[in-house]
Amino acid sequence: MYTKTDGELLQLQGLSCYLPEEGMVFNNVTQEFESRGIFRRSSLDDKQFWERPQPPGDYLKKRQKEFTLQKSDPNHVDLELQNYRVQEWDRRMNGFWFMNNGKPTYLTGLHYFYLTHWMLDTGYPDFRIPDLEFFYFLQYCIEDPHSLGMIECTKRRQGKTVRAGVFLYDLTSRAKNIYGGIQSKTLEDAKNNVFAKGLILPFKQLPDFFVPVYDTEKGQTPKSELRFFKQNKRGKNQEIYDPRTELESTITFKSSDMYAYDGTKLHRYVADECGKTKDIDVFERHQVVQFCLQLDGEIIGKCLYTTTVEEMDSGGEDFQRLWEASNQDERNANGRTKSGLYRYFLPAFKTLYYDKYGYPNEEKAKQYYMNERESLEDDSKALASYIRKNPFTIEEAFWKEGETCLFDSIKINKQLESITWMREKDLFHRGDFVWKDGKRDGMVEFKQSRKGKFYIHKAIPVDLEWNDVDKKGTKFTPTNVSKFVAGCDPFDHNVVASGSRMSNGAGYVYAKYDANSDLSETFICEYIHRPQTSDIFYEDMLKMSVFFGCKILVENNKIGIVKYFQFRGYEKFLMKLPKSKTF
């Protein structure tokens, strides 16, 4: 998926996924592309669809006979069963092609394993195009050396937990010394929903050739961890020789605590329902977990975050920070997103109706959801809740439900949606004020910088030469006072007493009333920063005032900035309150 091939290129939510050429798979053992052909259920296109491959007839009976004969002859194999085992391991490791309504369709090895052998409480999974795309996206993340994994958000009951289970199991059950970890919104959820239902339930239905030797000391059904170790033997049993190889790999679950896996090497990690986790900041927890997936700066493990989003006061706000930090379209010089993750959203209208080929009927689903929305139009709180639980867009997934809101939650959500998801560069200019050509007391210009201390309203044309200032000798007077005014809360001390908090200096510029301006009575410039010395702050405020050509009102108990302006010849930039004789 990650490496370019001669096969089809699919664009999936910002990732360029490369499929093998039709009928070809990449053999993970030989590290070469090899032909496997394309399975056809029928020669007729309309009768070509996914049908779970069946094991040989009387499989269990034949396997029991083979097992019995192997007790006296360890080299005995049933050729039919052996061919089936080799076939299924090949497909699990390398993938599978089949014809679907006349279209050659490629399944990743993990997706094939999920469809064919990962039995749920309702039976084996159906083939669905959204799942196909999910496993493509996941495989890309697994192969990408710059990715820590993926973060998935969609509506309820879409199989997120069981897909997380097969993701955990796959590598851990076929490689040595692999460690997998699980966290959910509570310890009980990690144990009962992910470990027991998403992992152990399907695990117990697997054919024996996909089940490594595991520790059954506490019973055939693991309750606290899945250990691919030989059972500890005691007493006379210590003398019994067991020739089977143990992988010495483990899958555990832990509480939602931020440091539960701190210091642990993780090769696979699942954070289930991370948008519902209360009392724990999942964004900050990820800062701990990500280092469990790395060794000396190299990524050695992959994670899968899954959730449906709940109210912001129930963990959603922290999840939104993690989501925003996982934008695959925004990467640093090392090729990574801020979180190391890539994000994946599945809209509700792709989850409701499917044809026999696995394609969602999006128009029918949209109409269904829109009918439901229209029926709730007279109850804005109920409508907001319904939209959030069945979102068409990621913005809707983060809508506030409005249970405790006194106002129209639909209008509030639409307004929040319009501003919350705007990027920084769409809202303001960020940078610093500097003296043009380094000439002090000359022209001030604005230099844009991602690390700048000043934020200026996007509508302000910062590339123009503002500087409405009158200079007479060494004295300066602002001449744009009818349009703008500034204010600041300074600090005078470079060092504070031990244990005291160092407050930031603050400065703002305000556009006065102007009937012809869209910026009338609007704050247009912000500065909240504490430079190393107070003089640097004073100079920043001076340059800001010069750029806009306006007066500045300073807190009158901080005399340092007043003296600085007076010493520099900018006393007339200082504003006096009405009836006040001092600045």
Q: What feature does the model see in each segment?
A:
Residues 1-149:
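Pre-P-loop entry segment of helicase/translocase ATPase cores
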Residues 2-17, 23-24, 31, 35-38, ...:
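RNase H-like, metal-dependent nuclease domains and their acidic two-metal-ion catalytic environment used
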Residues 145-168:
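Walker A/P-loop
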Residues 149-151, 179-181, 268, 551:
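Residue-level preference for the first positions of well-ordered beta-strands
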Residues 171-178:
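Post-Walker A helix-loop "phosphate-sensing" segment adjacent to the P-loop in P-loop NTPases
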Residues 179-257, 419-422:
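Conserved nucleotide-state-sensing and coupling region of NTP-binding domains
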Residues 206, 332-360, 565-583:
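Metal-dependent DNA phosphodiester-chemistry modules and their immediately adjacent helices/loops
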Residues 268-353:
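Signature of the SF2 helicase/ATPase Hel1-core->accessory helical subdomain module
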